[in-house]
């Protein structure tokens, strides 16, 4: 076992059922944490052993531990005490809470039963759970009351609290494609550039792509291309901050022409460069390797 392991930040997410633990674990995943949902406390020592033996390649971990684990109260405090004696792990407990009326309302909306009152009234289970979790809540380093928080607001609060300056929380993925091969199924925004002048009709450019300077210069020189770039970058400059504020971890922007060789490739490269200073950007060309004698 390595003795020179890197330090591990661990967040244990717990709290009242229905208070937002699912949103919380998704938020930590967006922050680059290695996440495990419903880890039984008895498995925590073995889990940490595996992390350490791996050389701590996962140095940020978020775990959901709650009443779904049958041995929750028997083993959790023992595991927490053991963690306190571990020099290479810094554990923090994030406790999510909400008032009774909010929790009852959420259970009614989802039509789910409370885990401690599967055949009874939700409030009975809530009251019992609140009593059982009282000591654990007292040991929490951070408590968030989600009674008046929308999922997006809870996500924002977690990101603001746990994000580091080097954490990548939002990325812009730009992909070129050919309409003849179908739309990218993961696209959030699709722009059709088939109205732009087509290098396919210039014989010596036909075998080239938008990655070639001659082709990109040809596509970009037209007034309609410049107008398109002006309008699209202005639109995206407005939209992207709002996507980020809503808690999205990435936005996929698809630029399409007929075959995905010339115009879409040129514009995808341009838009990727345009936003590279402000966001983490990735540019890919889905259909650039598909070469058939067709309009590009």
Swiss-Prot record:
Q: Indicate which residues the UniProt annotation says bind ATP.
A: 15-22
Quick check: keyword Zinc-finger in the entry?
no
| Signal sequence bounds | none
Q: Name one GO molecular function term.
A: ATP binding
Q: Read off the InterPro entries from this record.
A: P-loop_NTPase, RapZ-like, RapZ-like_N, RapZ_C
Q: Which UniProt keywords apply?
A: ATP-binding, GTP-binding, Nucleotide-binding
Q: Provide the binding site for GTP.
A: 66-69
- Taken from the record, one Pfam family name reads RapZ-like_N
Q: Does the keyword Flavoprotein apply?
A: no
> In terms of domain of life, where is this protein from?
Bacteria
Q: What does this protein do?
A: Displays ATPase and GTPase activities.
What's the family?
Answer: Belongs to the RapZ-like family.
Q: Which PANTHER family does UniProt cross-reference here?
A: RNASE ADAPTER PROTEIN RAPZ
Name of the protein this chain belongs to: Nucleotide-binding protein Aflv_2526
Query: Can you name the source organism?
Result: Anoxybacillus flavithermus (strain DSM 21510 / WK1)
């Amino acid at each position: 076992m390595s003795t020179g392991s890197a330090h591990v930040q661990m967040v244990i997410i717990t709290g009242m059922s229905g208070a937002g633990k699912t949103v919380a674990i998704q938020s930590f995943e967006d922050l680059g944490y290695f996440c495990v949902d419903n880890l039984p406390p008895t498995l925590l020592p073995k889990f940490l052993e595996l992390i350490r033996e791996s050389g701590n390649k996962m140095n940020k971990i978020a775990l959901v531990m709650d009443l779904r684990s049958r041995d929750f109260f028997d083993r959790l405090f023992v595991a927490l005490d053991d963690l306190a004696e571990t020099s290479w792990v810094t554990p923090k407990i994030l406790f999510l809470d909400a008032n009774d009326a909010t929790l009852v309302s959420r259970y009614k909306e989802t039509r789910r039963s409370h885990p401690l009152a599967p055949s009874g009234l939700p409030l009975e289970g809530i009251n019992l759970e609140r009593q059982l979790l009282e000591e654990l809540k007292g040991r929490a380093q951070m408590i968030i009351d989600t009674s008046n928080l929308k999922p997006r607001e809870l996500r924002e609060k977690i990101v603001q609290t746990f994000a580091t300056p080097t954490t990548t929380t939002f990325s812009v993925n730009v992909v070129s494609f050919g309409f003849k091969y179908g739309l990218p199924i993961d696209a959030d925004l699709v722009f059709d550039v088939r109205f732009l002048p087509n290098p396919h009709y210039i014989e010596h450019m036909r075998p080239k792509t938008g990655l070639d300077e001659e082709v990109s210069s040809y596509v970009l020189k037209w007034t309609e291309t410049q107008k398109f770039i002006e309008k699209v970058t202005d639109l995206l400059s407005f939209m992207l901050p709002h996507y980020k504020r809503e808690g999205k971890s990435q936005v996929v922007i698809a630029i399409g022409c007929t075959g995905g060789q010339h115009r879409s490739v040129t514009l995808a490269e341009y838009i990727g460069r345009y936003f590279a200073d402000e966001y983490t950007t990735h540019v890919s060309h889905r259909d650039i390797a598909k070469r058939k004698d067709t309009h590009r």
